[in-house]
């Protein structure tokens, strides 16, 4: 190796500093994305649970000249799909809060964001499950919302958003936050997978 190819004395510290800085930035980014996901999930859940509207619906019965009005109240508990959405988001909120606390504790005690290999496996599997849960919940509610807005004439379902405009608006706002939470969480899922398989890559390199 010639003189020109020899590493300068400052190369190793500089590369080490860059690696440490990159690892620190990744830790902060993952925690920030988990926090953002948690906030969006809480907003989506709070909007759906608190969403309620009572409206007088005009009904004209056959053989009656006058129109009667029935009071109806729209809430999340009336539709099974929306109940699933509320339950799924509740689980996701609890998980995200726990993972944030566990992540902070792991960073403060070990300096790593994943800790041991077993912890990395648990995080990887649970992140995958929660991501699927969030996607399925948002998809179900999106389909229910579409039918509520457009109706389904083939099975005789009328659209109801013309009568419950405020409820449908809040419903849609909750759904938007749920999809944004899912988008924010996807990079976290990718990072947890990256950390797990990097552990096995490092172990394989050491054994050679």
From Swiss-Prot:
Localization annotation: Cell membrane
Membrane disposition: Multi-pass membrane protein
Sequence ranges on the Cytoplasmic membrane side: 1-27, 109-120, 190-208
All ranges on the Extracellular side of the membrane: 49-87, 142-168
Keyword Glycosyltransferase appears in the UniProt entry: no
Coiled coil location: none
Residue ranges crossing the lipid bilayer per the database entry: 28-48, 88-108, 121-141, 169-189
Keywords: Cell membrane, Membrane, Transmembrane, Transmembrane helix
GO cellular component terms, semicolon-separated: plasma membrane
NCBIfam families: A_tha_TIGR01569
Self-association and partners: Homodimer and heterodimers.
Family classification: Belongs to the Casparian strip membrane proteins (CASP) family.
Protein name: CASP-like protein 2U9
Native organism: Selaginella moellendorffii
Phylogenetic lineage: Eukaryota, Viridiplantae, Streptophyta, Embryophyta, Tracheophyta
């Amino acid at each position: 190796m010639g003189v020109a190819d020899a590493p300068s004395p400052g190369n190793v510290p500089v590369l080490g500093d860059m690696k440490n800085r990159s690892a620190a930035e990744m830790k902060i980014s993952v925690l920030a994305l988990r926090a953002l996901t948690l906030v969006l999930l809480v907003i989506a859940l709070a909007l759906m649970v608190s969403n309620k509207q009572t409206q007088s619906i005009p009904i004209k019965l056959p053989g009656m000249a006058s129109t009667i009005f029935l009071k109806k109240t729209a809430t999340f508990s009336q539709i099974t799909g929306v109940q699933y959405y509320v339950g799924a988001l509740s689980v996701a909120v609890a998980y995200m809060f726990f993972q944030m606390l566990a992540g902070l504790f792991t960073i403060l005690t070990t300096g790593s964001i994943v800790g041991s290999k077993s912890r990395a496996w648990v995080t990887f599997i649970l992140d995958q499950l929660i991501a699927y849960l969030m996607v399925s919940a948002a998809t179900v509610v999106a389909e229910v919302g579409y039918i509520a807005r457009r109706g389904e004439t083939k099975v005789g379902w009328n659209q109801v958003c013309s009568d419950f405009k405020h409820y449908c608006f809040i419903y849609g706002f909750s759904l938007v936050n749920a999809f944004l939470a899912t988008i924010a969480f996807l990079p976290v899922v990718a990072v947890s997978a990256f950390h797990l398989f990097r552990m096995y890559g490092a172990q394989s390199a050491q054994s050679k």
